[in-house]
């Protein structure tokens, strides 16, 4: 393997592992890693907001909700990959 590739792999590993080492267990009590949904719902509920309508359908469990989210992300990634591949292939085609 080329020296440049080795340095790049080490840099990626350091970038991926550094946050885990720095924040290992710190800040969990203060809610540093709470999701944006939790913060937003808390801020909205403090104002006394009442929703205008109810959802048409709610997934029966959290697992199905996660499945639908993952499926949506996969479809989006496929579309983005197709568009990038299409334009890259169009740029390389001999016309």
Curated annotation (Swiss-Prot):
It is found in: Cell membrane. InterPro entries: CbiN. Pfam families: CbiN. Keywords: Cell membrane, Cobalamin biosynthesis, Cobalt, Cobalt transport, Ion transport, Membrane, Transmembrane, Transmembrane helix, Transport. One of its GO terms (biological process) is cobalamin biosynthetic process. GO terms for cellular component: plasma membrane. Forms an energy-coupling factor (ECF) transporter complex composed of an ATP-binding protein (A component, CbiO), a transmembrane protein (T component, CbiQ) and 2 possible substrate-capture proteins (S components, CbiM and CbiN) of unknown stoichimetry. One of its GO terms (molecular function) is cobalt ion transmembrane transporter activity. It is a multi-pass membrane protein. The chain crosses the membrane at residues 7-27, 67-87. The keyword ATP-binding does not apply. It comes from the Archaea. This is Cobalt transport protein CbiN. Belongs to the CbiN family. Part of the energy-coupling factor (ECF) transporter complex CbiMNOQ involved in cobalt import. Signal peptide: none annotated. The keyword Transmembrane helix applies. Pathway: Cofactor biosynthesis; adenosylcobalamin biosynthesis.
């Amino acid at each position: 393997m080329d020296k440049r590739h080795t340095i790049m792999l080490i840099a990626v590993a350091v970038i991926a592992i550094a946050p885990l080492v720095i924040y290992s267990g710190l800040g969990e009590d203060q809610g540093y890693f709470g999701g944006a949904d939790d913060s937003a719902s808390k801020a909205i509920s403090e104002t006394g907001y009442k929703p205008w309508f109810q959802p048409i359908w709610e997934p029966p469990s959290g697992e199905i909700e996660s499945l639908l989210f993952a499926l949506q992300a996969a479809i989006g990634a496929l579309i983005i990959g197709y568009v990038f591949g299409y334009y890259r292939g169009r740029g390389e085609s001999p016309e």
